[in-house]
Amino acid sequence: MENSKIHFSYPLDKSDFKLIEPYTYICESSGKGFRNALIKSFDYWLKVGDEKVQDISKVIQGLHGASLLIDDIEDNSKLRRGKPVAHSIYGIPQTINSANFVYFLIMDQCNKLGDPKATTIFIEELIRLHRGQGYDIFWRDTNTSPSEQEYMNMVNEKTGGLFRLGLRLLQAFSDNNTNYIDLVEDLGMYYQIRDDLINLVSVDYQQNKSFCEDISEGKFSFPIIHAINADSNDNRLLRILKQKTEDRSVKEHALEYIKSKGSLEYTEKKLNVLKEKIIKQINDLGGNPILMKLMESLENSSI
């Protein structure tokens, strides 16, 4: 069924919309819109204007929605924003095809933004995003704990990908050539590490996803990596991650172990260091009240 909120520049037949129903379904449960708000905040500096901001926001929103369809399959997730994941309704084959279909529809939109660099930027960041996702999956599926630095490098590739893409597309249409990459990558790092913490401690997250979902997925998140590295002679957390358990009592034991190693406090300290670094960069770049307000709202949400 065609959704009035779903628009692509490529001319789709009315019947084509049944092919992207998994994508339409996931778009019905919109997130907090942080990435779109981030693009708008950078336009405070870049002065591109509302029309181009909206066009680029549609690219980021479309790419993000399609990537979530694939992520949920790769992570064997059950819920997304409190609703059944798309592939549990439409099946894995159609969901994969729908996501890939949307990737190319979004690439077509990039091609029509009006700057030849836009498509190149899109491809470069999609390569980096998939590289990061690949490492994340490799570590999980081989039960191999990365170092903290390896994890942060992966986050720069994966989570930083959509953040950088939005900034780079916006800057392609701006006369402002100031380098904001370090700032946007630090924002991506803050966003991901904070999400890692929320996954383990947030009541809201547990209601919309599940209790300690990263443990059930066998995922190596920032606090989990710290807890593993805190005692190389104790392999219990690695063993639990390898099981990809749904057993709440086992996950509660894992969480208590993570707490006992001071990993949640360590993660909070890392977030505070990142926050101060981000604020300093914003001020050094001339200030940005919209971005500062966005940081404040991010800091105070979902925990």
Curated annotation (Swiss-Prot):
Its EC number is 2.5.1.-, 2.5.1.1, 2.5.1.29, 2.5.1.10. Pfam families: polyprenyl_synt. PROSITE patterns: POLYPRENYL_SYNTHASE_1 (PS00723), POLYPRENYL_SYNTHASE_2 (PS00444). Keywords: Cytoplasm, Isoprene biosynthesis, Magnesium, Metal-binding, Transferase. Dimethylallyl diphosphate binds at R80, K158, T159, Q192, K209, K219. GO terms for biological process: farnesyl diphosphate biosynthetic process; geranyl diphosphate biosynthetic process; geranylgeranyl diphosphate biosynthetic process; isoprenoid biosynthetic process. It catalyses: isopentenyl diphosphate + dimethylallyl diphosphate = (2E)-geranyl diphosphate + diphosphate; isopentenyl diphosphate + (2E)-geranyl diphosphate = (2E,6E)-farnesyl diphosphate + diphosphate; isopentenyl diphosphate + (2E,6E)-farnesyl diphosphate = (2E,6E,10E)-geranylgeranyl diphosphate + diphosphate. Its cofactor is Mg(2+). Pathway: Isoprenoid biosynthesis; farnesyl diphosphate biosynthesis; farnesyl diphosphate from geranyl diphosphate and isopentenyl diphosphate: step 1/1; Isoprenoid biosynthesis; geranyl diphosphate biosynthesis; geranyl diphosphate from dimethylallyl diphosphate and isopentenyl diphosphate: step 1/1; Isoprenoid biosynthesis; geranylgeranyl diphosphate biosynthesis; geranylgeranyl diphosphate from farnesyl diphosphate and isopentenyl diphosphate: step 1/1. Mg(2+) 2 binds at D71, D75. GO terms for cellular component: cytoplasm. Mg(2+) 1 binds at D71, D75. Coiled coil: none annotated. Belongs to the FPP/GGPP synthase family. Homooligomer. This is Geranylgeranyl pyrophosphate synthase. The gene is ggps1.
